[in-house]
């Protein structure tokens, strides 16, 4: 039985070595079979319907200085903003007008009472909508308060499951253990919990990416949001490449397909970063590869320009 045959029998039926060998393959015929198999599993699990989420980028103020990020604390070229309540409410109303069942609040990572209360108020405005938060590392008390206010899902990206690589792309004050602890805390508190990685980081290997997929399963994630690494001109990242079998874009599509084959029933986001590299077809190809969630950016244009995570970031 081939690895692909095994993947179609049951979830988590591939080992890390098999995932790595598939990721490293340059056989286009094999990849056509893998993408078709991912679609087959998606249909088998009832994941063919694309789930829309209205995305609101509430603030680009961030206390973290992650080396890769355009809105990192140390980037003094970024004009900072925090959306006033009336603008947030306007976005929530637009989510309802479009008939989307869910809204997602995303922002730079800030802790403190003012920030906690800001999102409590906005979550309370979303009655009748499913609320996803992507607001980074917080205390257990804060996560509890937001859940009590009505939040249902939380996405906190680990960016890489390789601790050594994590340390290379973050300043010393950013703790891998704390971030992993937040993922586990969110699960324990009853959130529908998601995480994900960047694909194509300097120093990253195929073995790292295969381990990332296994990490998703080991942590029993409900959602996965991952996408290609797109270098920001104001980044502090080293300008180095490793040898990949293909581009960050193609490898991201392959990661989506293999994550679907490994986890089966998970919700996978077709990341906006795919359209930074393929503006016409990026997210559609993500859906074809096995994803089933689309985030539509509803942030007003006057704020959206400031949420500059990476070059070419899609504005819709």
Task: Locate predicted features.
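Core AdoMet radical
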Residues: 73-89, 95-183, 192-199, 222-225
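Catalytic cores of alpha/beta
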Residues: 139-146, 202-216, 276-288
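Auxiliary Fe-S-binding modules of radical SAM enzymes
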Residues: 1-27, 96, 217-316
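Conserved, mostly hydrophobic/aromatic
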Residues: 38, 66, 156, 186, ...
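Glycine-rich, proline-tolerant flexible connector loops at the mouths of alpha/beta enzymes
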Residues: 53-56, 76-79, 103-116, 164, ...
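Canonical Radical SAM [4Fe-4S] cluster-binding loop centered on the CxxxCxxC motif
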Residues: 47-87
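Flexible, acidic/Gly-rich N-terminal and inter-domain linker regions that tether
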Residues: 1-64
């Amino acid at each position: 039985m081939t690895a692909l045959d095994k993947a179609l029998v049951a979830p988590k039926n591939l080992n890390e070595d098999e995932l790595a060998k598939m990721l490293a393959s340059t056989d286009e015929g094999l990849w056509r079979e893998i993408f078709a198999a991912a679609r087959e599993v998606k249909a088998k699990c009832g994941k063919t319907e694309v789930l829309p989420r209205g995305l609101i980028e509430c603030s680009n103020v961030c206390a973290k200085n992650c080396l890769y990020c355009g809105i990192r604390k140390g980037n003094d070229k970024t004009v900072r903003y925090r959306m006033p309540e009336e603008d947030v409410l306007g976005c929530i109303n637009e989510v309802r007008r479009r008939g989307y069942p869910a809204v997602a609040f995303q922002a730079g990572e800030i802790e403190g009472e003012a920030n906690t209360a800001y999102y409590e108020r906005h979550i309370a405005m979303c009655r009748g909508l499913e609320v996803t938060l992507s607001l980074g590392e917080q205390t257990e008390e804060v996560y509890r308060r937001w859940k009590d206010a009505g939040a249902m899902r939380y996405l906190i990206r680990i960016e890489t499951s390789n601790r050594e690589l994590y340390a290379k792309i973050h300043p010393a004050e950013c703790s891998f253990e704390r971030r992993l602890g937040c993922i586990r805390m969110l699960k324990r508190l009853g959130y529908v919990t998601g995480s994900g990685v960047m694909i194509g980081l300097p120093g990253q290997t195929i073995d790292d990416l295969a381990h990332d997929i296994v990490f998703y399963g080991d942590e029993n994630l409900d959602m996965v949001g991952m996408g290609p690494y797109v270098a920001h001109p104001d980044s502090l990242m080293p300008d180095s490449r490793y040898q990949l079998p293909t581009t960050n874009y193609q490898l991201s599509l392959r990661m989506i397909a293999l994550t679907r084959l490994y986890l089966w029933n998970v919700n996978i986001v077709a990341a906006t970063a795919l359209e930074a590299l393929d503006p016409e077809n990026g997210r559609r190809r993500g859906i074809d590869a096995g994803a089933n969630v689309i985030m539509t950016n509803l942030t007003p244009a006057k704020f959206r320009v400031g949420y500059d995570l990476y070059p070419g970031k899609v504005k819709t």
